[in-house]
């Protein structure tokens, strides 16, 4: 896949389908308003908690870097939202919730309402629901999908973006088991050991509010910070050609998943950790 390294984000008003395709093909981040009433009503925090609180979502501890344990732990949505609402650890967020979307039927609503975003010759569509504690930051990472969209349905998020040509300064880690390409750098509070390289990196900052959506091209690094109690829909697409271009990485993913065994960390550990943080405060 080709990529662009210009340090700029395009902002467009009410684009047509044709205009959106043309701009996305430039491979630059794009922000635009996308007020889809069905998605805004169905996928906001209040409705999710009311209608689907008894279903499981996946919770991730952003401070857990143990490669021998599972990254994600299932929680009832109402339990996860309680942690997000009451916890002050600023380390838990939820993603990779495809099973949740299927069980609740929300995936059909996302499929019915993404025609404007879906590129031509698409071979695979992936949908996700992302939310987290106020103040939590997702890892700095990039994806290989042909198109990646993040759509804010409630709350507010901040995003930091880094172009692909700065990868050499980011200590890239390729995790084929989870198919995640990440960096240990925290762009929000840079660690001392990475400050020299951080000075060589140019960062773009975005703020997204309800009804706004961002397109993040393949190979662009990004990290999200939840500044309020927020919910975000993620739409990812592969085309036949992009899958072919990424076939070496996809093969590595399949091979790695056959060879790795991970330990499950206890659900009670998350609850105890959250209680300890509350007691300190």
Model-derived regions, located:
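N-terminal accessory scaffold of Fe(II)-dependent oxygenases
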Residues: 1-213, 221-281
């Amino acid at each position: 896949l080709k990529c662009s390294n210009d340090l700029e984000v395009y902002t467009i008003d009410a684009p047509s389908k044709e205009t959106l395709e043309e701009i996305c093909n430039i491979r630059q981040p794009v922000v635009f308003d996308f007020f889809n009433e069905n998605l805004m009503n169905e996928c906001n925090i209040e409705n999710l908690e009311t209608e689907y609180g008894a279903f499981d979502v996946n919770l991730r501890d952003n401070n857990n870097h143990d490669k021998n344990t599972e990254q994600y732990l299932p929680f009832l949505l109402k339990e996860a939202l309680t942690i997000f609402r009451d916890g002050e650890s600023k380390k838990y967020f939820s993603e990779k919730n495809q099973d949740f979307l299927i069980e609740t039927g929300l995936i059909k609503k996302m499929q019915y309402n993404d025609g404007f975003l879906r590129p031509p010759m698409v071979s695979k569509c992936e949908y996700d629901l992302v939310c987290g504690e106020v103040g939590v930051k997702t890892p700095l990472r990039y994806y290989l999908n042909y198109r990646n969209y993040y759509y804010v349905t409630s709350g507010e998020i901040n995003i930091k973006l880094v172009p692909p040509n700065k990868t050499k300064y980011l200590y890239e880690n390729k995790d084929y088991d989870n198919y995640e390409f990440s960096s240990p750098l925290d762009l929000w509070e840079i660690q001392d050991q990475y400050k020299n390289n951080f000075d060589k990196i140019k960062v773009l900052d975005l703020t997204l509010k309800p009804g706004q959506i961002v397109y993040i091209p393949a190979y662009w690094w990004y990290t999200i910070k939840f500044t309020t109690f927020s919910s975000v829909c993620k739409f990812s697409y592969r085309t036949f050609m992009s899958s072919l271009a990424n076939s070496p990485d996809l093969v590595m993913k399949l091979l790695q998943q056959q060879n790795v065994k991970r330990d499950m960390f206890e659900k009670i550990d998350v609850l105890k950790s959250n209680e300890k943080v509350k007691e300190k405060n």
